[in-house]
Amino acid sequence: MASLEVSRSPRRSRRELEVRSPRQNKYSVLLPTYNERENLPLIVWLLVKSFSESGINYEIIIIDDGSPDGTRDVAEQLEKIYGSDRILLRPREKKLGLGTAYIHGMKHATGNYIIIMDADLSHHPKFIPEFIRKQKEGNFDIVSGTRYKGNGGVYGWDLKRKIISRGANFLTQILLRPGASDLTGSFRLYRKEVLEKLIEKCVSKGYVFQMEMIVRARQLNYTIGEVPISFVDRVYGESKLGGNEIVSFLKGLLTLFATT
């Protein structure tokens, strides 16, 4: 009697399984907020619309840092409207920094991918399906939105702020040579474990934090894909970029140059 031979397929790596079984993936959006009462309902509605139309499994985690304008009250209402399985409010008592906001949010995230973005409508959720497609095409560890590549751009800024932004990006390219076109942007998709590792390594605060994340990613040989995005100045509220932030950015840039 001929023996029966059972062929066994080789064990697939986690990354192969993620690429071949996209419906099993879940995307956790981290939304740090401070005085975003007017913007929050619209950005959440746009996120829900984009994910629902694309058939993407998601959750939105709102990390409010003690906003005095009632942002937390709005977030509580959104949690009731969309359900606590989709909208998770995880507030803190005061402003404690962007990096710690991400750490706090990730503690509650159940997705295997993390999306970070601004809550002020500067980043449109319509680009998220493109981020996900890009990640799958190249099996990237990180996908970053870029204002400085392809048809990406900035809208609503005056000439002064455009010059500051371009100048800052030019300096970072010259000094750090990161291999990515937009270091100061904050619209990105990460594998959850990659973001956890990067936050462990990063020491910067404020606007330099996002820049260091990309620099450290290159040091750790993580792969980075880019998607051109349109960045639009905030619809409601005042910009949080001022003179102190610019000085802090320059100090942080020089520190990274000296230590990386």
Swiss-Prot record:
Pfam families documented for this protein: Glycos_transf_2
Entry-annotated residues carrying Phosphoserine: 3, 9
Entry EC no(s): 2.4.1.83
Details of cofactor binding: Binds 1 divalent metal cation.
GO cellular component: dolichol-phosphate-mannose synthase complex; endoplasmic reticulum; endoplasmic reticulum membrane; membrane; nucleus
Pathway it works in: Protein modification; protein glycosylation
Keyword Nucleotide-binding attached: no
Major subcellular location class: endoplasmic reticulum
Cofactor: Mg(2+); Mn(2+); Ca(2+)
Binding of GDP-alpha-D-mannose, residues: 32, 34, 36, 63, 65, 118-120, 147, 234, 240
Keywords: Acetylation, Congenital disorder of glycosylation, Congenital muscular dystrophy, Disease variant, Dystroglycanopathy, Endoplasmic reticulum, Glycosyltransferase, Magnesium, Manganese, Metal-binding, Phosphoprotein, Transferase
Residues that bind Mg(2+): 120
Compartment(s) where it occurs, according to its Swiss-Prot or TrEMBL record: Endoplasmic reticulum
GO MF annotation terms: alcohol binding; D-mannose binding; dolichyl-phosphate beta-D-mannosyltransferase activity; dolichyl-phosphate-mannose-protein mannosyltransferase activity; metal ion binding
Top-level class of the enzyme under EC nomenclature: transferase
GO BP annotation list: dolichol metabolic process; dolichol phosphate mannose biosynthetic process; dolichol-linked oligosaccharide biosynthetic process; GDP-mannose metabolic process; GPI anchor biosynthetic process; protein mannosylation; protein N-linked glycosylation via asparagine; protein O-linked mannosylation
InterPro entries per UniProt: DPM1-like, Glyco_trans_2-like, Nucleotide-diphossugar_trans
UniProt binding sites for Mn(2+): 120
Disulfide bonds: none
PTM-bearing positions, type N-acetylalanine: 2
Entry-linked PANTHER family: DOLICHOL-PHOSPHATE MANNOSYLTRANSFERASE SUBUNIT 1 (PTHR43398:SF1)
Subunit comment: Component of the dolichol-phosphate mannose (DPM) synthase complex composed of DPM1, DPM2 and DPM3; within the complex, directly interacts with DPM3. This interaction stabilizes DPM1.
Family (UniProt): Belongs to the glycosyltransferase 2 family.
Role of this protein: Transfers mannose from GDP-mannose to dolichol monophosphate to form dolichol phosphate mannose (Dol-P-Man) which is the mannosyl donor in pathways leading to N-glycosylation, glycosyl phosphatidylinositol membrane anchoring, and O-mannosylation of proteins; catalytic subunit of the dolichol-phosphate mannose (DPM) synthase complex.
Disease entry from the Swiss-Prot or TrEMBL record: Congenital disorder of glycosylation 1E: A form of congenital disorder of glycosylation, a multisystem disorder caused by a defect in glycoprotein biosynthesis and characterized by under-glycosylated serum glycoproteins. Congenital disorders of glycosylation result in a wide variety of clinical features, such as defects in the nervous system development, psychomotor retardation, dysmorphic features, hypotonia, coagulation disorders, and immunodeficiency.
Annotated protein name in UniProt: Dolichol-phosphate mannosyltransferase subunit 1
Organism listed in the record: Homo sapiens (Human)
Gene (name only): DPM1
